[in-house]
Amino acid sequence: MTTFTDTEKVFLELYKAGVWGEIAHKDVLVGKHIDWKAVLGMAGKQAVVGNVSDGISLLRETEMPQPLKMKLITYVLTVRKNNETMNAAIPEIYRLLEDIGVVPVLLKGQGVAQNYRAPLSRQSGDVDLYIPDTQQIAEAYKLCQQNMKMIEPLTTDTMEAVFQYRHVVVELHGRINAYVNKTLERRFPAWCDAMFREEKERKVCIGGGFAVLPSLRLDLVFVFVHLTRHYFGGGIGLRQIADWMRLLYAHHADIDQEQLMRDVTYLGIEKIWKVFAAMAVDFLGYPKDKMPLYNERYADMGKQVLRYVLDSGNFGYHDVRTKSKSKNYYVRRCKAFTGNMSKILRNFFMFPHETIYNIPGYLKSGIKRTRF
């Protein structure tokens, strides 16, 4: 039976309050000793400190120790500052690329942040720019080499390169990878290309300039595919789930639900969507009437997925099954291997196809990272 501790319940209530702007349930917060250090620790592991802080701000009063309050304030100010830095950099990057006739598509990140109640509270990551044209990405790569610090060179197999621009990590993508299951891997590239040809991209204001986002139809699928790819590949935090929920919520009136149903079915991710939809509605506060493809039959699976998310943390970095205090390198690698295999296999009874599909990739990646 899947259960949550009292501290986890408090954390989830504050997370929901921050994401949706609703006061947390008093029966969870009132009359109980709250381990604020543990709550904020969970928020850090899930990369949602800003959201939880927003939730705490809605409380009339808290008994949080003053040192923790100061630590929280400092962290939140850093999150906001990082967002402001990234928002200022994006228009500059667009202007650089526009000078050579390249207009990239901004994926995830600061684009989905626009859907939040408080965009600056979202913990930022990288600037991901998609440039599908082979010649254009080569030109953009050359320009970035001249104006940015290169972290990783362009690779022909993944068509990705990584740079640093004014303390902001910038990733160029010439291809969108969708390694979740065989159906998605086979169908997504052509479907994605069709979306860029047929659907209108969106232009948004960021940092006093502009950025181009994918069409809504594509973004709804891409953001979900991205989070499920990381879920099956190692783990995700509630930040990625908040990105997806806020995207759906902000645009629910414009979503063609029948078209979305056809898309996720064609791409082989219908069941995964329904499980995550049940998790969002039944445990994370998403309004039931605004969730596409919600089915209460998947509530137990949704609860189990939430349990896994809490156990693993952002990108799976905080899962204790992968950690070892041994000074021996090979003992640590063995612990990481068995722990990560356990994380992958835990999904087998819910998602057998995705579990089996992801094992070879994990083994290949693990061998590549191991020193012999």
Protein language model features and the residues they cover:
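Conserved NTP-donor binding/palm subdomain of two-metal-ion nucleotidyltransferases/polymerases, i.e.
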Residues: M1-G125, I131-F372
